[in-house]
Amino acid sequence: MPRATNSVASRARRKRILKKAKGYWGSRGTILTVAKHAVDKAEQYAYRDRRVKKRTFRSLWIMRINAAARENGTSYSRLMEAMNKKSIDINRKALAEIAVKDPAAFSQIVKSAMG
């Protein structure tokens, strides 16, 4: 009796890998063994960078808040310290958004925190 290899499942697995590798350069998108390595590495980068994205955005928000704070005569660290002492609870994302979109409101926040 011939050996059963379940070719339906094998083909589906290969198709799934090649579908993920669609658009990759050269043999990375067409040859299964090369595509398998490329897809594995891409998924590792995706996993890592979902975590790095959080750090990157926090860093961006801090830069924006610092730039706006310096326009108002203080620094980021002094502003955050003053806001904590006055119990002004605005997260960095919202504060950065206010700093960019509504500088007048940000100035009021700085005055109330520093005042």
Swiss-Prot record:
GO terms for cellular component: ribonucleoprotein complex; ribosome. GO terms for molecular function: rRNA binding; structural constituent of ribosome. Coiled coil: none annotated. Signal peptide: none annotated. One of its GO terms (biological process) is ribosomal large subunit assembly. The keyword rRNA processing does not apply. Binds directly to 23S ribosomal RNA and is necessary for the in vitro assembly process of the 50S ribosomal subunit. It is not involved in the protein synthesizing functions of that subunit. This is Large ribosomal subunit protein bL20. It comes from Chlorobium phaeobacteroides (strain BS1). The lineage of its organism: Bacteria, Pseudomonadati, Chlorobiota, Chlorobiia, Chlorobiales.
